[in-house]
Amino acid sequence: MQTLNNKISNKTPFKNASDALTSILFLVLSSLLLVGCGGGSAPIDLNPPSNSNDTPTTDPVVTDPVVTDPVVTDPVVTDPVVTDPVVTDPVVTDPVVTDPVVEPTYKVTGTFCSCGPTSQTNSSINRDTENLDYLDGVLVRISWADMNPQAGIYDWSYLDEQIGYAEQRNTKIALAILNGPYAPTWLAEEGATMFEYTLRGNVVSLPLPWDAVYLSYYQAFIEELGARYSGNEFIDLVHITNSTTNGFEMQYTFDSAQITDFKTAGYTEELLINSWTTIIDAYATAFPNKPVDVEVHPVFFSDKIATDVVDHGLALYGKRFGVLAAWWSEHNAKNVYTSMFTILKKVQKESFAGVQLVGAVSTGLNPLTEEQLAAALQLAIDNGFYYMEIWNNDLANTQLSDLITNNDNLIEAQTAVQ
């Protein structure tokens, strides 16, 4: 201790006792602190907890909330962009104008000769009517048998000759293929069923009109006929024919026993109608640019055949399909065939209708008086039937020339304004 005090005394001069005491206390405290820093002694906690089980408690730090004034910004107002509207002139295009489809008008008109059939010994176009200025054409009738002598074999010489005569005279032809009793006899050998009856005192036969073999061969013939002549300029009209009593008209002039036999052979209205429509289609197809017509008669006192057949033709072929009355007289139109007269008037409004005089003034067969002939011609004019077949005997009768000429002038005047 002495040594220490001497060292202190020697190195630290004090001015008085108070300074010396303060220095001593500082040294003591420094020594204690140095001892407390050793590894074996516990640290001195100047603020020990009051109880070892108490958890330290700290006062929460309370801070005033930071209040910031909301940032208020003036809305950005932009003027709308106004652009002038783009005005474009409308595109104006000329409308597409298409010409309407106009169905051809088939003016089947004029004075035609109801001349005799063409055969090996007779010509429909003959010298009796050679120099008649009012004559517009000739009915040329040729039998199917003459033009189709064997199955698949055709002889066109008869018709070629008539066309040659027509060309020389610059006249027209109304063509009719005689069927029925004028059908080829070889049809029976090919299997067609034939029906016998009496015509003008002669026993003849015709193929049953609904027979499949008959229809097949007749259709084949019509097709060949059209292939050869459909474009011929001298053929003005084609009469459609079927297997009937006289091979030209629609009727069957059977007696009661023959009617019974015909029905026993299978006749029904439906079968006959189907036969007619099949043949109409064949002719219309074979002659696509020619007017065609069918003669109308009651069949066994029924109008159904004629009505249905005509409706079929009009529906499919329109203005190209017409009708013919081969019974024409004023008396027949107003008293006998009134329903057929009605059909003619109906068809005339839609296409065309023609007449063939039932008789002649100049012959003893189906005789007419001159007054009856004049009345028949006038009735046809009054109803718009401007196609007329007049018997060649009357055409060659000079006493009737003025009557027939005046009638033909009326036809020309009426058709000129259509």
What residue spans do the PLM features occupy?
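Aromatic-lined substrate-binding rim segments of carbohydrate-active enzymes
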Residues: 131-198, 269-275, 279-282, 376
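The substrate-binding groove and active-site-proximal loops of carbohydrate-active enzymes
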Residues: 143-156, 203-216, 265-270, 363-366
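Substrate-binding cleft of secreted/luminal carbohydrate-active enzymes
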Residues: 174, 178, 319-418
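Bacterial Sec-dependent N-terminal signal peptides
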Residues: 27-101
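An active-site-proximal structural segment forming one wall of the substrate-binding cleft
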Residues: 162-167, 202-240, 275, 279-282
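Aromatic- and acidic-residue-enriched segments that line the glycan-binding/catalytic groove
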Residues: 181-201, 243-263
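Aromatic-lined carbohydrate-recognition surfaces of secreted/lumenal glycan-active proteins
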Residues: 116, 234-245, 268-305, 323-328
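Catalytic domains of carbohydrate-active enzymes, especially glycoside hydrolases
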Residues: 111, 115-146, 172-174, 285, ...
